[in-house]
Design a protein with these regions (language model features):
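Long, well-ordered, tryptophan-enriched scaffold segments
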Residues: 2-6, 182-326
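N-terminal amphipathic, basic-rich helices that act as targeting or association modules
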Residues: 2-90, 245-267, 272-285
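Acidic, glycine-rich active-site loops and adjacent beta-strand->loop/helix elements
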Residues: 79-84, 151-158, 179-185, 287, ...
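A glycine-rich helix N-cap at a beta->alpha junction
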Residues: 93-109, 170-187, 205-208, 365, ...
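Glycine/charged-rich beta-loop-alpha catalytic/anionic-binding loops adjacent to active sites
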Residues: 38-45, 104-120, 142-148, 354-368, ...
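A short alpha/beta connector and helix-capping loop motif
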Residues: 158-180, 190-203, 294, 387
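Non-catalytic terminal/interface segments that mediate subunit docking, oligomerization
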Residues: 74, 277, 285-398, 403-413
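Cofactor-binding active-site loop characterized by glycine-rich and histidine/acidic residues
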Residues: 50-171, 322, 339-340, 344-345, ...
Length: 437
């Protein structure tokens, strides 16, 4: 049974619908962000949940709901573990203390829970394709609502995300993607795309040019000045990054912007929402912002159980977990057999392959959120005499069924698939059950 609802702070407690949010002066929105963070930290200390990701999207969520009006407009969150703030801003703040509890709010977006949850999820790489389908349906029906896909940079390591990007420009003229770049999935992001996004963030040349023009543009004021600013930024960026990835997919790129600057986010979203071309807005956020323990340990606070608000400490388990036993045992085996390799898909700490990574970095491979590639990569290793161990959560291993059957089993390749989190997952719910174990 759920506990009584705690009293909400003043601004947050006043929001029950879009009109209530619009009544709050823009100057007060940073205070609303503080109230949301405080409520999340206090509530999740009891229930557990995905604290770090949600602390990182507070300002983005506020800006989205100031500019767009759900449920008419559609906001689709990739994975949707970062949708807690969205729920709080759409009439569910008083229930946030029930998140991931029996008969409480789901820890993910859920269509049956609220009409504001346009699309349910739980796995990565789904938002862009689903949003594109909604855009196609809107266009076919002659309707005029906005569709916004919100995806973390880790989702761009998914093949499905790249498949969606490849289809956007030929499907619709009105499509908005927000790339929430915090450099993390569950663990630190890996691969060429992660390096590419970082290069966009840290270009000293572009940052210098943008800073030099900012004061001049602010003095101009008005709509024309705003349009000039966006055009100037786009032109400058294209000179510095002539082969900008998203331009090649037919998307107009904006950013990178400070994802914690509410006024800038609101101005930018208001500008791009009426463009007659597909756009991608790249924002940079800090996972765990507002809670020092989450900033110090982003992996731990990606998702966890109850914790002490004061220091973020969690209650330790009296006995080793199955994952810990698996990780340490594989390290012991690898000491005796140099052909053993370990593969994971952005979940080194969860599967405890971080122990293997520390002991044998050259034989450890993190493929990012690309389970299918990881399975096929393991098949290639096995075909050449190596002994690959693929450690992936059971719920994500479902994506590898074809590779397990067609590539590993049919060819009798000795790939060891090690499924973590087997069986039922009561906290995360049906999207994370290991139903096929």
């Amino acid at each position: 049974m759920n506990s009584p609802s705690p009293e909400l702070p003043e601004l947050l407690g006043s929001i029950h619908n879009h009109a209530d949010l619009m009544q709050i002066p823009e100057a007060e929105l940073p205070r609303l962000a503080e109230e949301i963070r405080s409520t999340l930290i206090q509530s999740l200390a009891v229930t557990g949940g995905h604290l770090g990701p949600n602390l990182g999207v507070v300002e983005l969520s506020i800006a989205l709901h100031r500019v767009f009006e759900t449920p008419r407009d559609k906001i689709i969150f990739d994975v949707s573990h970062q949708a807690y703030v969205h729920k709080m801003l759409t009439g569910r703040a008083e229930q946030i203390h029930t998140i991931r509890q029996y008969q409480g709010l789901s820890g993910f977006a859920k269509m049956s829970e609220s009409p504001h949850d346009s699309y349910g999820a739980g796995h990565a790489g789904t938002a862009l394709s689903a949003a594109l389908g909604m855009c196609a349906a809107r266009d076919l029906k002659g309707e005029d609502y906005h569709v916004v896909a919100v995806a973390g940079d880790a989702a761009f390591t998914c093949g499905t995300t790249l498949e969606a990007l490849n289809n956007i420009s030929q499907t619709t003229r009105r499509y908005i993607t927000i790339l929430n770049d915090n450099e993390w999935a569950i663990d630190k992001n890996v691969g060429a795309l992660a390096k590419y996004f970082n290069s966009l963030q840290t270009s000293e040349t572009f940052s210098w040019l943008r800073d030099k023009t900012a004061s001049f543009i602010e003095k101009l004021g008005g709509t024309q000045a705003k349009e000039f600013a966006f055009k100037l930024e786009g032109t400058t960026k294209n000179l510095i990054f002539p082969s900008l990835l998203f331009n090649k997919f037919g998307l107009r790129y904006f950013g990178p912007l400070n994802g914690h600057d509410i006024p800038t986010l609101i101005r930018t979203l208001n500008y791009i929402k009426d463009l007659n071309e597909p756009v991608i807005l790249h924002i940079v956020t800090q996972k765990g912002l507002g809670y020092q323990p989450a900033l110090d340990n982003p992996t731990k606070f990606h998702g966890l159980g109850s914790y002490c608000v004061h220091d973020g400490e969690t209650q330790g388990t009296p006995t080793p977990t199955f994952s810990q036993i698996f990780g340490s045992t594989l390290v012991d085996m690898a000491k005796q057999d140099e052909s053993i390799t370990a593969i994971t898909a952005a979940m080194a700490s969860g599967t405890k392959l971080d122990l293997f990574k520390e002991a044998f970095p050259r034989r450890y491979f993190d493929v990012g959120i690309a389970e299918e590639h990881g399975a096929l990569f393991a098949c290639g290793l096995a075909a050449e005499g190596m002994k690959p161990y693929v450690a992936i959560y059971s719920t994500f291993m479902q994506r590898c069924v074809d590779m397990i059957q067609h590539d590993a089993a049919l060819q009798k390749l000795p790939v060891r698939f090690c499924m973590d989190r087997a069986g039922l997952s009561p906290d995360d719910g049906p999207t994370h059950h290991g139903l096929f174990d």
